Amino acid sequence: TLWDAEGKEYIDFAGGIAVLNTGHRHPKVKAAIAAQLDNFTHTAYQIVPYEGYVSLAERINAVAPIEGLKKTAFFTTGVEAVENAVKIARAYTGRSGVVAFSGAFHGRTMMGMALTGKVVPYKVGFGPFPADIYHVPYPNALHGVSTDDALAALGTLFKTDVDPRRVAAIIIEPVQGEGGFNICPPAFMQALRALCDDHGILL
């Protein structure tokens, strides 16, 4: 339950945009935050790594279902993570293209807005946006877009707008929030994985 400055009560069904799944001000979360305050006063890990950062990264690396070398980095916001994912994908592949989906929301920075798949309310009055960003329909039966339709749109994009050999990454939300809480069909995710593997595109 949340209370505003005028005393109105609200039930938070969104969990603070899905980051408060234990509830607002959960005692265990507050205790963990307080304990961390005793461990450091500066959290810029790129300047001086600290134990909590390194140990959490090592724990994630230990359980990540990836073979070979693994690295973990933490970021302050979702859009910061997205921007760094795009930079890493472009640096790793040597390619510049990125494909995103209609209805997607990836943040309010210029790159985040470029990747976002809705004009209103995020893109109105801004721009120009970073180049080499492409959008295709998100598979959503409620909007009349089947898995086959979305895959066909990707095929058309690769024939008409961008060679897949120029695409560094495809970014997708398995569950869209801003787009309407749409769940991506598993068959589409599997086909997307295969398509990315065929073309050397990161997903």
Q: What residue ranges belong to the model's regions?
A:
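Glycine-rich loop-to-alpha-helix module at the N-terminal edge of alpha/beta enzyme cores
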Residues: 9-95
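PLP-dependent aspartate aminotransferase-fold enzymes
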Residues: 58-169, 186
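Alpha-helical transmembrane segments of integral membrane proteins
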Residues: 176-178
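Flexible, glycine- and charge-enriched loops at secondary-structure boundaries
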Residues: 46, 147-148, 182
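Catalytic PLP-binding core of fold-type I/II PLP enzymes
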Residues: 164, 182-203
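Active-site and channel-lining beta-strand-loop segments
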Residues: 1-11
